[in-house]
């Protein structure tokens, strides 16, 4: 039997961890030469577009990792199935 609030707590935990990761974890910063090389490689307009894509991918990856960690913790210590 699943816990009745498991889906609600999972979503709330993901949102809380996403907020904490946005506030506390540093996003990657590239050097100017590497950033300009990536802009040319991916045919982007300017550095703003590159950093927008970079931040989206960064926080998407962090969110996926945090989701997996939260799910593992929930099933390991708080699950009712034992």
From Swiss-Prot:
Keyword vocabulary terms for this entry: Cell membrane, Membrane, Transmembrane, Transmembrane helix
Gene Ontology CC terms: plasma membrane
Keyword 4Fe-4S carried by entry: no
Membrane topology per record: Multi-pass membrane protein
TM region(s), chain numbering: 8-28, 50-70
Top-rank taxon, per record: Bacteria
Subcellular location: Cell membrane
InterPro entries for this protein: DUF1158
Keyword field contains ATP-binding: no
First-listed, main subcellular location of the protein, grouped into a coarse class: membrane
Pfam families: DUF1158 (PF06643)
Protein name in the entry: Uncharacterized protein in ramA 3'region
């Amino acid at each position: 039997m699943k816990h009745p609030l498991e889906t609600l707590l999972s979503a709330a935990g993901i949102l809380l961890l996403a907020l904490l990761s946005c506030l506390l974890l540093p996003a990657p910063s590239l050097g100017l030469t590497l950033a300009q090389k990536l802009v040319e490689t991916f045919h982007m307009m300017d550095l703003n577009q590159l950093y927008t894509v970079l931040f989206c991918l960064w926080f998407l990856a962090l969110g996926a990792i945090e989701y997996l960690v939260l799910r593992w913790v929930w099933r390991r210590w708080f699950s009712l199935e034992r």
